[in-house]
Amino acid sequence: MKPTLLVLAAGMGSRYGGLKQMDGLGPNGETIIDYSIYDAVQAGFGKVVYIVRGYFLEQFKETVARKYSNVKCCDGTPLEFVFVTQELDKIPARFTLNPERQKPWGTAHAVLMAADVIKEPFVVINGDDYYGKDSFRIAGDWCRAHEGSEGVYAIVGFELDHTLSESGGVSRGICHYDAEQHLTNVVEHLNIQKDADGVVRGDNSVTGEHVELAAKDLCSMNMWGFTPDYFAKSGAIFETFLEQNLMELKKEFYIPYAIDCMIKAGSAKCDVLSTPSHWFGVTYKEDRPAVVAKFAELAREGVYPTPLYK
């Protein structure tokens, strides 16, 4: 069984000031998605599903997909690609969209867009985050171990200290889990940064307190492992969400919220998988030079070929 990689690439990139998913950062203009796909193929994945916005679908296909025409899976078969759009009006038929809403419905809604094209265990990632080789290996192994299972999902947790930006505070969901390494909840913390004294601090979004955080705390970078039964469970929660928030202009349906609902209802468990990989990405424009330098370093060290694709 070859897992599927689901890439969330519909984000607007407002803080960065452009479509981060299409920004060339590698030595030969490679995008972060290019590296994610390379790592996923090496980890045994067989299909890539992109979730994009309709207005840049064709540009996205031309810029990204043409690079992979010669990419083969581990078994020598061609890597499969599917493109799906996330649009505001893609909601259950019994609901009528508020015509004033412009904001996308959120990450969990984006995942639901792929329900008809994914029938195997799959991994969700952001299109503008670099997760590292070990993360894809760990997530791919989890998928293969859970083929045919239901109600057990996974989150790949990154050490908080491996996810900070030198250009400003970041928001991170801190993972809390029990003795069996099952997720209990994800608590969003805002404005996280390392202070002058070397201590990491941030604002707890639940209590409002400015708190000290451990550098080794595991946090979510939106890398999840799911089996196909997730779609039905999440779809039912989305309908309840719409019943309560249909007329809201800003409320979003996020993956951690859907998972939290399942955990509270006892309908699913979520394994917390720890990765040694360092995350990096372009949260702010000021992050870009450091990311470009990091990819150049990885190429010099032989971690990746250059160019990445031929």
Show the residue positions of the predicted features.
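A structural signal for short hydrophobic beta-strand segments in well-ordered beta-sheet cores
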Residues: 22, 175-177, 272
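Hydrophobic helical membrane-anchoring modules
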Residues: 264, 269, 279-310
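Conserved core of the sugar-phosphate nucleotidyltransferase
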Residues: 133-223
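Catalytic beta-strand/loop signature of glycosyltransferases that borders the donor
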Residues: 218, 270-277
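Short, surface-exposed amphipathic charged segments that create phosphate/polyanion-binding patches used
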Residues: 93-104, 168-173, 286-290
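Conserved nucleotide-sugar donor-binding
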Residues: 223-234
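Conserved N-terminal catalytic core of the sugar/cofactor nucleotidyltransferase
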Residues: 1-7, 13, 30-124, 131-132, ...
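A C-terminal functional module that forms or caps the active site or interfaces directly
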Residues: 235-268
